[in-house]
Structures are given as structure tokens and as C-alpha cells.
Swiss-Prot record:
Record-stated family: Belongs to the L/F-transferase family.
Family matches, as SUPFAM superfamilies: Acyl-CoA N-acyltransferases (Nat)
The entry's keywords: Acyltransferase, Cytoplasm, Transferase
GO molecular function list: leucyl-tRNA--protein transferase activity
Stated role: Functions in the N-end rule pathway of protein degradation where it conjugates Leu, Phe and, less efficiently, Met from aminoacyl-tRNAs to the N-termini of proteins containing an N-terminal arginine or lysine.
Name of the protein in question: Leucyl/phenylalanyl-tRNA--protein transferase
Biological process (GO), any one: protein catabolic process
Catalyzed reactions per annotation: N-terminal L-lysyl-[protein] + L-leucyl-tRNA(Leu) = N-terminal L-leucyl-L-lysyl-[protein] + tRNA(Leu) + H(+); N-terminal L-arginyl-[protein] + L-leucyl-tRNA(Leu) = N-terminal L-leucyl-L-arginyl-[protein] + tRNA(Leu) + H(+); L-phenylalanyl-tRNA(Phe) + an N-terminal L-alpha-aminoacyl-[protein] = an N-terminal L-phenylalanyl-L-alpha-aminoacyl-[protein] + tRNA(Phe)
InterPro entries tied to this protein: Acyl_CoA_acyltransferase, Leu/Phe-tRNA_Trfase, Leu/Phe-tRNA_Trfase_C, Leu/Phe-tRNA_Trfase_N
EC assignment: 2.3.2.6
One cellular-component annotation, GO: cytoplasm
Domain of life: Bacteria
The gene coding this protein: aat
């Protein structure tokens, strides 16, 4: 297993990212095909979760995935699950629920609440009190990425103003790297994902990285790419421009409008 080598740090912003793309980060990540020829997925151990390290990793197709009591592990799966936002197909039942709901979607209004909710135990056998791999260090790191304009959340609010679902991830250039989602009301995370697809389509975000394939994602229109093909596309995508997302960039969107062609409205 390759350890990550330290190098000089630089400050990165979404606006200056393209100019700095060749000298990003504090660590030189290994070439996935060289250190993981069998496609297991893990390509490095070590480093830290500083913003410049994370942005450098994502720009090279890697993401961190490790338990709280383990060293940082960097992954680049083979194959890679991705979604083209224009290929997304919501189910008929989800369309019906959206049409009848009085809920709202927002962008970047409750990032910390969303990532904390994503960290809580699911119905996957975790003991009471245990969290997912999204532990305190990860929460702190992605909150910092949110403050710097790279990490974004989509929230779903019910008609009582309660947060009932959401998701978060990173946007670099014209690719969105999905990280996690949650729901406490039926299908709320699916509505958040639908909202994300709408937002990506109108913002020139042409690919969503879903990391690992599963039956649910494939049913929504996701596909798999070989690691080589994903990394080839990534080089272009991270250099492309896309519309800015920030806390006050977009108005709330009624869930009932998800099935319409009306775009997610920008604030004036």
C-alpha cells in the first residue's frame, strides 16, 4: 500500500481552481492503475483531510473512505458508477408524490445539518450510538470545503418547515461528486436527488460521480465506466466551467415543480 507523500500547500478557490490545477494539494497521490492493477479500489493510505488535500484527491479521481479508528484510506473504484443528469428517470410513484407534495427544496441552506444527519445510523445493523464512516473529522473537513465554496447540500423541507431529507457532495468544474444522502420521511432523499439532477442539468454539470454502483442507482439511470475512462473524462470535466452555487444563488423550489420544465430559479 502506498503512503501519500507531502508537498507544498496552496490555497484553492472555485474561481482559481483551473489555473492551479497542475499544482494542487499537499500530497502527491499515486497513479491508481499502477498501485491497484487488480481493481480492488484502495490506492493510498495516509495524509490528512485539509481542504487542499481533499480537492487534490477529488481532482485525481480519489475520495476518502475509512472508519474513525483507522488511518485515512483513499479510494478509486473499478468500475466507477456515474450518472449523466440528463439521463435521470424518476419513477412514476416518485412523480406522483412530488406532484402532491407541499414540500420545498433548497440549496446550501443547512449543510451542517445535512452532513450530521447523513452520519447517523441507518437500518444497516450499526449498534446504537455508532455512526457511519462520516465521523467528526470528516464532518469538520467537509464543512470547511462548504465554507470555501466546493461542498454543497440539497435540502428537503416538509410543509411544517422540518428538514426531512437531503444530500451533499462536491462540485468541481462540470462534475459533481456525490457523497451521501439521508431521509426521515418517505422518498425525501430521492426527491433531493431529483432536485440535484435538475440543478446539474441547468448549471452545465454534465456528470455526477456516484462512486460505487448499486441496484437503486442503476435503476435511476446510472451507468458504470472503467476507471481509465472515468479518469480520462475527469481531466476535461474539472477544467470546464459551470454556474456558481452558493447559499444565496438559488431560490427555494417547490417539490411539485420538479416534473415541470421550469428551471430552479436564481435569486436576482
Amino acid at each position: 500500500m502506498n503512503n501519500i507523500n507531502d508537498s507544498s500547500a496552496i490555497h484553492i478557490t472555485p474561481e482559481t481552481f483551473v489555473k492551479q490545477i497542475r499544482s494542487l494539494g499537499r500530497y502527491n497521490f499515486p497513479e491508481p492503475a499502477l498501485v491497484d492493477p487488480d481493481g480492488i479500489g484502495i490506492v493510498g493510505i495516509g495524509g490528512n483531510l485539509a481542504p487542499e488535500t481533499l480537492i487534490s484527491a477529488y481532482a485525481q479521481g480519489l475520495f476518502p473512505w475509512f472508519n474513525d479508528d483507522e488511518p485515512i484510506a483513499w479510494w478509486c473504484p473499478e468500475p466507477r458508477c456515474v450518472m449523466q443528469p440528463t439521463d435521470y428517470q424518476p419513477s412514476k410513484s416518485l412523480r406522483k408524490q412530488a406532484n402532491n407534495a407541499r414540500w420545498q427544496l433548497t440549496l446550501n441552506q443547512a449543510f451542517n445539518e445535512v452532513i450530521h444527519a447523513c452520519s447517523l445510523p441507518r437500518s444497516n445493523g450499526l449498534p446504537e450510538g455508532e455512526h457511519t464512516w462520516i465521523h467528526d473529522d470528516m464532518i469538520e473537513a467537509y464543512n470547511e470545503l462548504h465554507a470555501q465554496g466546493f461542498a454543497h447540500s440539497v435540502e428537503v423541507w416538509d410543509d411544517q418547515g422540518q428538514l426531512v431529507g437531503g444530500l451533499y457532495g462536491l462540485k468541481i468544474g462540470s462534475i459533481y461528486f456525490g457523497e451521501s444522502m439521508f431521509h426521515i420521511a418517505s422518498n425525501a432523499s430521492k426527491l433531493a436527488f431529483w432536485g440535484l439532477m435538475r440543478l446539474c442539468t441547468q448549471s452545465n454539470v454534465t456528470l455526477v460521480d456516484c462512486q460505487l454502483p448499486n441496484e437503486h442507482l442503476m435503476s435511476l439511470g446510472a451507468i458504470t465506466l472503467s476507471r481509465t475512462e472515468f479518469l480520462t473524462q475527469l481531466d476535461t470535466l474539472i477544467s470546464n466551467g459551470s454556474d456558481a452555487w452558493h447559499k444565496n444563488s438559488h431560490r427555494p423550489l417547490a417539490v411539485s415543480l420538479l416534473g415541470n420544465l421550469q428551471p430552479w430559479q436564481l435569486n436576482p
